[in-house]
Amino acid sequence: MAVLCPARVSVAENKKFKLHTLSAMMMGLFTGSFAYAETQNTSNQEQEMPVLVVIGEKTQRSIYETSASVEVFDQDTIERTPGATEIDDLLQLIPNLVDSGQSNNMPTIRGIDGSGPSVGGLASFAGTSPRLNMSIDGRSLTYSEIAFGPRSLWDMQQVEIYLGPQSYIQGRNTSAGAIVMKSNDPTHHFESAVKAGIGESDYSQTAGMISAPIIQDELAFRLSFDQQKRDSFVDLAAFEPAGDPKKIEMNSVRGKLLYEPSALDGFKTTLTLSHMDSRGPQTENINVAGNEAFRPVYETASFTTAWDIIWHLNDLFTFENNLVYADFSYDRYTNPNSRGDFNTDGKEFHIEPLLRYIALDGSVNTLIGARYYQSSQDDMYIDAASAYPMDGRTKAKSVFAEVTYALTPSINVNLAGRFEREQVKRNVSHPRYKLDYDETSSVFLPKLDVAYTPVQGQTYGIKAAKGYNASGAGLAFNSMQFTGFRPYEFEQESIWNYEFYTRHRFSHSVEVLTNLFYNDFDSMQMTQTTSSGDVFIANLDEASTYGAEIGSRWYATSSLELFANLGLLKTEFKETTGNTKELPRAPKMSANVGLLYDFGQGFEFSSNAAYTGSYFSESGNSEKFAIDSYWVANAQLAYVFEHGRATLYATNLLDSDKTTLYLSTNNTLDQLKQQPRMIGASVQLNF
């Protein structure tokens, strides 16, 4: 089947939503799905689709009770997604989310840069403040871990990707969205697995897992590890002390101990120890002609201890607590001839107790919690002339509550609120470029959500919620002619999010989820570059985004599942000069389609294709740095047998090499491109 790509349209001229060929095709699939499902309701042709349970909002809900725009990948879905071994493999499939590839830039969600107001050196000097939160088993990763670190999908129970502000429930650094990853817990029966994979670009994966009881039905453990290696597709020159920048490696090791004492009914506790490390080039942008590519190398490492408690006190109340302590470090190594090293060592701690109440008749569901977070990190920037010591300290205290009340049998009202107080310190000890920032700010983050369910399987709702990103300070510099650093401060950013959502389930085989949104920003933080080359973070007067996400799944038969998702987006902001522009990396349309097909005796075929519309690389909206629309297609064939599965897959099946981002506004050669096609295979054995 041929894929029809839209002709290139000037980004500057394409100022309106256009539901062109791709939209029409997808909407046709939606409506065609409804018609078929309603008229072909025979048990031998259809399979009842499972109901997804969402866990990332601190309360378990079905997808039909969840107002957030969220993509859910359980373990089975991850295994059946072509070539999915790390979180980036999933992010590239989500409409209204742009993941440009390996670089300083984290994904944008609904046009909002998940990296925060700055990336690279400016972010390092200012103290990073991302808008996208990524957590693994309750611990939120740092900016450098999200951008450069390991995010393995091995032995993951579920991954949830939230589009839109999550500040009211997740707290700091979630104004763009959140990625919640939950690994598998120990089991009270023995299970184990090993996996080996190989692929082009010298890719390899070696992974294993074992889970077993120690005391039957009381004490159990689980151990898992994953190592993935590959070579960068960009030709890079080796230098000391970094070695070969082409070599990319990530390692994850996790151990869990689960205790459910028989003498204490309803109580369970889990202790988790995990280590993650990675190394690779800071960016995989193509080489500029005539220059040797002495690309900086980033190495990250972290060790985390997490202790979780769940105690069902009685039929009404449940107490939970999550405690996390982590050590982390990351090091940037550069060519000594143009040295710009950066080293960080840090620690963080948080504790989050919760109390839940659920009425016996289910009419009231209440959550009350508190959170204390503190982190400290010591940084050092080292150039050819000197070293610049820096340090940062953050403390955040918050209390939050959520109440869901059944106003009538068909109307539910959800009220939530979070009060957060955050202290941020940033210090640079250099006598010429001294920075001493110490500010405390408070914010109240409310949410109101009203859902109407006239009949089972049909829900309509509206919600309003507030998000924020903390204030801060940093050191500005000149990108054209470096003459030193200049200290500056920027204010807190806030966002009001309004959404209308629907959830539909037809004949137990068709699912349609929609979210229409409008986001209004106050004092949006954005990197600004003056005509003279000065780079710093400033607060904008006006910014807004609006659009929609539409998703559908159709269990056409007991062996065939089809899905299609569409994202629409419009963004605008007013520069400090007064000019109105579009936000960078904010395509007006993005989409994906795919299928899962079981056939023969144990064979599975899965494929997907994702489309990303044209967008600008930078806030100036220059046509010179505009990105053409692009596709990526993936396919996988698996054979499932009694004790495992064997898989053959291809990512970027058509070997598309479109540009995804221009990293510099000084030239058009410094650009990221799609990773080339990779064909690989893996074998997993279960015992």
Swiss-Prot record:
It is a multi-pass membrane protein. GO terms for biological process: iron ion transmembrane transport; siderophore-dependent iron import into cell. Pfam families: Plug, TonB_dep_Rec_b-barrel. Keywords: Cell outer membrane, Ion transport, Iron, Iron transport, Membrane, Receptor, Signal, TonB box, Transmembrane, Transmembrane beta strand, Transport. Induction: Expression is up-regulated by low iron concentration condition. Iron-regulated expression is repressed by Fur. InterPro entries: Plug_dom (IPR012910), TonB-dep_rcpt-like (IPR039426), TonB-dep_rcpt_b-brl (IPR000531), TonB_rcpt_b-brl_sf (IPR036942), TonB_sidphr_rcpt (IPR010105). Involved in the uptake of iron in complex with vibriobactin, a catecholate siderophore synthesized by V.cholerae. Binds and transports ferric vibriobactin across the outer membrane. The energy source is provided by the inner membrane TonB system. This is Ferric vibriobactin receptor ViuA. It comes from Vibrio cholerae serotype O1 (strain ATCC 39541 / Classical Ogawa 395 / O395). The gene is viuA.
